[in-house]
Structure formats: structure tokens, C-alpha cells
Design a protein with these regions (language model features):
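Extended, subdomain-level signal for the structured scaffold at the beginning of enzyme domains
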Residues: 1-127, 140-258
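Glycine- and acidic-residue-rich phosphate-binding/metal-coordinating active-site segment common to enzymes
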Residues: 130-131
Length: 258
């Protein structure tokens, strides 16, 4: 397997820790060169709830953060490995073989409609390079429209994994905040409040892939049975339970490329 150069992109407003940690560790362990990029060029910090091993998802009524995963995320956050990401606007897709988007609720704020990130993805698509997106970062693909496809989404006609609508934090009196683990005065994320999740990924993806595409929204996905889709050039994953499978699938596909 030849070593590849992989650009890994993350939000500055709250990753779901494992959705960055797992693909980061897996792609590095496979021997590839990784470069981290964020919108602001600041360390990507995890949502505090994503490093809380006692957190019980109130919708699916299950714990989502294994203690050993929380420990590893904190090691990376407290250490230096993620200290100096480049800005999206300073990255050039010509320097990389693959672009990997990671998830977290913050992705809906600063990745989904980010012009600089969209340009990187367009440049990847135009040069036939692998593009990955996990959980809420799939929204970046939804909102990226292609003039060569009559302004349809770049995922039109594709098979794409989507966070199930039945898992969304949606209901009366939700007040969701984006508190970060490891926040500092110059990297504190946002104090925005949203009434649950910002938007329903499943519905957006169904619309974006169109009648000839497939939205795979598997509400039964779990750590034992994760959900990842591969439809060149896209690798997409459902949510945090599929983070490891997402990283492994990217490594698997990279191994097939010259």
C-alpha cells in the first residue's frame, strides 16, 4: 500500500469527539500522512457531552461514549497533536489524495455552507479524489451544488448514509448548547442555543440524492453493526457508532488507489 496524503477537516464549534478521534487514529495507524484543517485554524475541541462516559442519549436511551474512547479523545485534546491545524482557506486539494470530513453538531454551523470547504471538495471531485463525510458533516455535501449537475447536490444519484431523523433531538422545549471540553478564552466555541439539532439530516439527504439515489438512514445502527456507505467518490457514515467503521472504510478504499 502506498502512503497517501489525507486532509482531515473538523469544526471549531464542537466535534463529537470520537467522530474526529477514530478516523484520525485509524488513518494515521495505516501509515498515511494526515493534515488537520479547521475553519479558524484553531484546535478542534469536542463537545463536553461527547467525552462524558456517563452521557445517556435521551432519544435512543443509550450511552454513546465508552470510557476508553473518552480517555483517548481527552489525550488528543489535552496534548499537542491537534494544536496547529491549518485553515480551510489555506489548504490546497492539489496537495492531498483524499479529503475526510468529521462530524459533530458544530459542523452544521461552520462546515455545512463553508465556501472554502466547498471549494476543497469541488477540487477533489474534479480531480477524482476520495471524499469522506461523517454524521452532520454530510450536510456539507448536501449544500454543495454543482453547476455541471444543473445545481443539484454533488451527492445527487449517490448512495449516502444519513443520521436518522428518529435520532434527532427534536421536540417541545429543547434548549441545546454547544459547551466544549478544553475551551480557552481564545478558543471557546459558541454560546448559541438551538431548539434541538439544527436540521434533520435524513430528510435533507433524501432530497439531495434525488429519485435515483439512495439515502441509507439506519436507525438500528450500533457499534456492533455500524453503517457506512461507499459510492465513489464518497464514503459516508451515519453517526458516532460508525466512526471506527468510517475510518476503516477510508483506509480500505485508499489501499485500492494508485
Amino acid at each position: 500500500m502506498s502512503k497517501k496524503k489525507v486532509l482531515i477537516c473538523a469544526t471549531n464549534y464542537g466535534t463529537w469527539g470520537e467522530e474526529l478521534q477514530a478516523p484520525w487514529d485509524i488513518i494515521k495507524a495505516a501509515g498515511h500522512d494526515v493534515t488537520l484543517a479547521t475553519p479558524l485554524g484553531k484546535k478542534p475541541l469536542p463537545l463536553a457531552v461527547s467525552v462524558d462516559s456517563d452521557f445517556l442519549d435521551p432519544v435512543i436511551n443509550a450511552k454513546t461514549n465508552p470510557p476508553e474512547v473518552c480517555k483517548r479523545i481527552k489525550e488528543l485534546t489535552d496534548g499537542t497533536e491537534w494544536n496547529k491545524p491549518i485553515k480551510f482557506k489555506d489548504a490546497k486539494m492539489s496537495d492531498y489524495d483524499c479529503i475526510v470530513l468529521t462530524g459533530g453538531l458544530g459542523a452544521m454551523i461552520d462546515m455545512a455552507n463553508n465556501w472554502n470547504l466547498h471549494k476543497l471538495i469541488v477540487d477533489a471531485l474534479r480531480t477524482n479524489k476520495l471524499v469522506g463525510a461523517l454524521c452532520y458533516s454530510v450536510s456539507t455535501l448536501v449544500f454543495l451544488r454543482d453547476p455541471q449537475l444543473d445545481m443539484k447536490s454533488v451527492i445527487y444519484g449517490k448512495k449516502i448514509a444519513a443520521h436518522p431523523a428518529s435520532w434527532d433531538f427534536y421536540g417541545p422545549d429543547w434548549d441545546f448548547t454547544y459547551d466544549l471540553y478544553g475551551a480557552t478564552p481564545d478558543n471557546k466555541g459558541t454560546d448559541v442555543h438551538t431548539p434541538g439539532f439544527l436540521w434533520p439530516m435524513e430528510h435533507l439527504v433524501r432530497d439531495a440524492v434525488g429519485p435515483n439515489g439512495t439515502c441509507v438512514s439506519n436507525y438500528k445502527a450500533n457499534r456492533a453493526n455500524p453503517e457506512v456507505c461507499f459510492d465513489w467518490p464518497f464514503v459516508t457514515g451515519t453517526s458516532v457508532e460508525s466512526s471506527i467503521a468510517y475510518g476503516k472504510k477510508i483506509v480500505e478504499v485508499l489501499a485500492t488507489l494508485k
